UniProtKB/Swiss-Prot annotation:
Compartments where found: Cytoplasm
InterPro entries assigned: UROD/MetE-like_sf, Uroporphyrinogen_deCO2ase_HemE, Uroporphyrinogen_deCOase
Taxonomic path: Bacteria, Pseudomonadati, Pseudomonadota, Betaproteobacteria, Burkholderiales
Oligomer and partners: Homodimer.
Protein name: Uroporphyrinogen decarboxylase
Source species: Herminiimonas arsenicoxydans
Residue spans crossing the bilayer: none
EC number: 4.1.1.37
Protein family (similarity comment): Belongs to the uroporphyrinogen decarboxylase family.
């Protein structure tokens, strides 16, 4: 029995992803529910830990909605972590203050890799419960985005056992034992597709795949070990539910050189970091995909008038909208935890105000 969610009042974000006409350029921010907000920090304290926050649907709902109560954003994104997936695979996720995520049982040898299996999604029910609860609490204000890490980005953490400056362990496996790396990536691809589909079933109205570390790979290697598996995911992710289109976004940080290939991965939109010229990107992809991005998050430490100037540059770089074009304004990566919350108000208002003339 379908859950009777409220009708959507603001579908601007979804329309932009599908390259349909909009009155203005919609916007949201990667990590918009996060540590830069005092209300997030208060909820995080109540939850007791990051995992206490992410694994509790009530807390996850609360923090997902916090930026929407403060700013006129055009989408909500599920509050979760990409590493919930390898955690469900039995790698033992934990967090160390000041060091970030770690795994108790990283994939360091053939035995560990061969034992890796696609997990039962029941162990991620807390994520799907959060999706349904958030969608219900949104009451149709804006669409809800579900997400996952890409197969390669998840593999980086699974092999390294945490974050890394140089990815030497995972790259050594990639070059020395490509068979083991392909086994990990194939397992991840099957899991990520199922995970995104379960989020769609739970109420997500769009989905995004974060390939945060794709840009760490060499040309040629990226295509084999990251792009190929994102394409595998996209082949199996639902594009509609109950007759309604579910748009998808892929984002490789540092992937500007491969934009032409990423545009053919099977997603509706491609995210860009701040190193890419948006106008040149639009010319390159044509009307194959919408684009998302790509303001440097550090601009939010500047004065309000400078923020408005840089917003206008991004909007003008994309240019006037035409049939078949689509742009979702976003940062080129996640918002910094040190960002002044009032800078985000300036950003959101500037995007909405300055973009209207480009949609006339």
């Amino acid at each position: 029995m379908p859950t009777p969610f409220a009708p959507l009042k603001n579908d601007t974000f979804l329309r932009a992803l599908l390259r349909q006409p909009t009155d203005y350029t919609p916007m949201w921010m990667m990590r918009q529910a996060g540590r830069y907000l005092p209300e997030y920090r208060a909820t995080r304290t109540r939850a007791g830990s990051f995992l206490g926050l992410a694994k509790n649907p009530d807390y996850a709902t609360e923090v997902t909605l916090q930026p929407l109560d403060r700013y006129d954003l055009d989408a909500a994104i599920l509050f979760s972590d990409i590493l919930t997936v390898p955690d469900a695979m039995g790698l033992g996720l934990y967090f160390v203050d000041g060091e970030g995520p770690k795994f108790e049982r990283p994939l360091r040898d053939e035995k560990a890799v061969q034992a890796l299996k696609v997990p039962e999604l029941d162990s991620l029910q807390y994520v799907f419960d959060a999706v349904t609860q958030i969608r219900t609490e949104l009451k149709g204000r804006v669409p809800l985005i579900g997400f996952s890490g890409s197969p390669w980005t998840l593999a980086c953490y699974m092999v390294e056992g945490g974050g890394s400056d140089d990815f030497r362990t995972v790259k050594a496996m990639l070059y020395n034992r490509p068979d083991l790396m392909h086994h990990i990536l194939q397992t991840n691809a099957i899991t990520v597709a199922a995970y995104l589909n379960a989020q769609i079933d739970a109420g997500a109205q769009a989905v995004m795949m974060f390939d945060t570390w794709g840009g760490a790979l060499a040309d040629g290697i990226y295509q084999q070990f990251s792009l190929h598996y994102m394409r595998e995911v996209m082949k199996h992710v639902k594009t509609e539910k109950e007759g309604v289109r579910i748009p998808s976004i892929v984002f490789t940080k540092g992937g500007g050189l491969w934009l032409n290939e990423i545009a053919d991965v099977g997603a509706d939109a491609v995210g860009l970091d701040w190193t890419v010229n948006l106008g040149a990107a639009r010319a390159q992809v044509g009307d194959r995909v919408a684009l998302q991005g790509n303001l440097d998050p550090s601009i939010l430490f500047a004065q309000p008038e400078q923020i408005r100037t840089e917003v206008e540059k991004v909007l003008m770089s994309f240019g006037k909208h035409a049939p078949g074009s689509g742009h979702v304004f976003n940062l080129g990566h996640g918002i910094s935890q040190f960002t002044p919350p009032e800078s985000v108000s300036v950003l959101v208002d500037a995007v909405h105000e300055l973009s209207r003339s480009l949609h006339a």
